[in-house]
């Protein structure tokens, strides 16, 4: 070994110290030492620096041995790019230097080359020769360049508020969601097999006179439902039917589980009461451990997505629903909930109820019967060269959802005319103004500009939906405004149809809400439109 040094250490001393931390004197750790010292020498004196390593192997230990940067204090970041490189940089400005092991400089170093490029199998590597080559090569096989670290890396993210996970009851960062990451399945441990209560089972021939512990489901070609209900006494006449259902042994209520377990019917009732909000109802009699939610009125279904995801992360609990923002009919089912096992652990039930304690999962909002006006723009229509077909199309959609059309008008593609007509319709009492066409990039299309002249504010122009990408939303005073692009004339369903129910329900719409429409926002333009019984808008 030569007399090269790594910082304050001889190579032998460094290898001994490295072995104490790393477990053995790894070649990558020795190279990491040379790389750290080279990077330090290239920084201005007195620089308060932080470090980035581009591989999780060996390099982080070299940085932690030779600097005050560590994973624990947040000054060492491991960004696994698979490259044997590191960077030291000014923690405030981000200006720094990157050092890497340069494969182009290894022709004279066969042991290093075989190790780095994995052309020499590990069992054939001569560790003594390899370490000797690394010691003699030192920084001569390294290259470096100036780098500027991205602002997003310099930004120090605060952990934020700490919450107690409703499942495991341990503290965790609230930013991770409603349940800690360990309880979402990211824990690196084998999950224990789910435990359950000891239940009383009897052979079918011995079940006569016993009380059924749960609904026993019968499935035929035409129906599915309970043949024997929970709490029902099993009679001799039931045995053949139960055998035909494949029942040879049945659960009976001879042994009641202890207080740590909750029967599916009791558990699902507790969950349903916590989930149902305004405009939602459900039967107080569970069927097969399940409860179905119904709309108590015609309206817009609102599902709290964060709560929905979190409650489904609680073990042994499930709830499934139709999509949020769909128009639902009174007395039609839209969601169902049930525990997975016959008896739900009280801890799981408590966790689910804790998730649901802040707000209801489901609401059905009333659709307001807004007094509406329709403003058609287009010189060709105003002059009678083209017959208007927009008014009946838009009017039908408004009236279908309970709105009334109090006035209509047709004006040319003229900013002043559009602004004046807008004001007339608002003065006539319009609570919702729907304009048609004039929203594209053509120079004659000035509908948006005319609306702005009339006082349009809170403007959202454009949505990731096809058809209907050039939809416009906004308000003039207390009057809400929706601009329908020309595609609304030939396409049966557009972005207007997705958003009109939200407007009528008084739901605030922001840019993020529009962005979320992109997933499912491509209409297949079927010859026979079946919306909303299709994927569009979902």
Predicted regions and their residues:
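Non-transmembrane, aqueous-exposed alpha-helical and coiled segments at domain scale
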Residues: 1-25, 32-194
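A short glycine/serine-rich beta->alpha loop
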Residues: 16-25, 259, 320, 485-488
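Cysteine-cluster motifs in flexible loop/terminal segments that predominantly coordinate metals
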Residues: 171, 176-177, 181-196, 222-223, ...
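Short, low-complexity N-terminal leaders and the immediately following helix N-cap/first helix
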Residues: 195-288
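Extended, charged alpha/beta regions that create polyanion-binding interfaces
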Residues: 254-367
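Glycine-rich phosphate/diphosphate-binding loop of Rossmann-like nucleotide-binding domains
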Residues: 359-413
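Short glycine/threonine-rich loop/turn motifs
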Residues: 379, 389, 406-537
């Amino acid at each position: 070994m030569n007399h090269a040094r790594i910082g304050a250490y001889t190579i032998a001393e460094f290898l001994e110290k490295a072995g104490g931390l790393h477990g053995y004197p790894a070649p990558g750790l020795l190279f990491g030492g040379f790389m750290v010292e080279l990077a330090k020498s290239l920084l201005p004196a007195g620089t308060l620096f932080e470090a980035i390593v581009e591989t999780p192997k060996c390099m982080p230990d070299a940085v932690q041995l030779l600097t005050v940067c560590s994973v624990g204090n947040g000054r060492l970041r491991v960004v696994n790019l698979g490259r044997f490189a590191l960077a030291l940089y000014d923690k405030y400005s981000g200006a720094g230097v990157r050092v890497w092991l340069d494969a182009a400089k290894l022709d004279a170093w066969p042991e290093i080359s075989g190790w780095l490029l994995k052309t020499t199998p590990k069992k054939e590597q001569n560790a003594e020769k390899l370490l000797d080559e690394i010691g003699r090569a030192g920084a001569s096989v390294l290259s470096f360049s100036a780098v500027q670290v991205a602002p997003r890396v310099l930004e120090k993210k605060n952990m934020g508020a700490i919450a107690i996970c409703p499942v495991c009851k341990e503290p965790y960062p609230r930013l991770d969601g409603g349940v800690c990451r360990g309880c979402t399945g990211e824990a690196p441990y084998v999950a224990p097999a789910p435990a359950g209560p000891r239940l009383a089972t009897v052979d079918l021939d011995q079940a006569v006179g016993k009380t059924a512990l749960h609904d026993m489901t019968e499935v035929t070609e035409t129906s599915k439902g309970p043949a024997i209900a929970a709490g029902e006494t099993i009679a001799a006449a039931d045995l053949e039917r139960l055998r035909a259902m494949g029942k040879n042994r049945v659960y009976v209520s001879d042994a009641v589980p202890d207080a740590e377990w909750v029967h599916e019917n009791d558990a699902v009732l507790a969950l349903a009461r916590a989930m149902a909000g305004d405009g939602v109802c459900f039967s107080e009699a569970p069927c097969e451990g399940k409860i179905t939610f119904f709309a108590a009125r015609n309206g817009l279904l609102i599902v709290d997505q964060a709560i929905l995801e979190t409650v489904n992360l609680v073990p042994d609990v499930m709830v499934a629903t139709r999509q949020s923002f769909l128009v639902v009919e009174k007395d039609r089912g839209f969601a169902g909930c049930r525990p997975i096992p016959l008896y739900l652990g009280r801890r799981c039930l408590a966790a689910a109820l804790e998730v649901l304690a802040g707000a209801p999962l489901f609401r059905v909002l009333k659709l307001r019967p807004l007094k509406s006006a329709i403003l058609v723009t287009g010189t060709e229509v105003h002059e009678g060269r083209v017959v208007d077909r927009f008014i009946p199309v838009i009017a039908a959609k408004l009236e279908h959802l309970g709105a009334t059309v109090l006035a209509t008008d047709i004006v040319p593609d003229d900013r002043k005319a559009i602004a004046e007509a807008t004001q007339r319709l608002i003065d006539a009492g319009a609570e919702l103004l729907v304009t048609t066409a004039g929203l594209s990039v053509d120079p004659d299309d000035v509908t948006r500009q005319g609306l702005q002249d009339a006082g349009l504010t809170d403007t959202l122009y454009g949505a990731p939906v096809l058809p209907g990408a050039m939809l416009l939303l906004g308000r003039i005073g207390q009057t809400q405004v929706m601009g329908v692009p020309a595609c609304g004339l030939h396409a049966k369903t557009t972005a207007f149809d997705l958003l009109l129910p939200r407007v009528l329900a008084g739901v605030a719409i922001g840019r993020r809400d529009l962005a979320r429409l992109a997933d499912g926002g491509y209409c297949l333009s079927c010859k026979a439109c079946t919306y909303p019984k299709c994927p569009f808008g979902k």
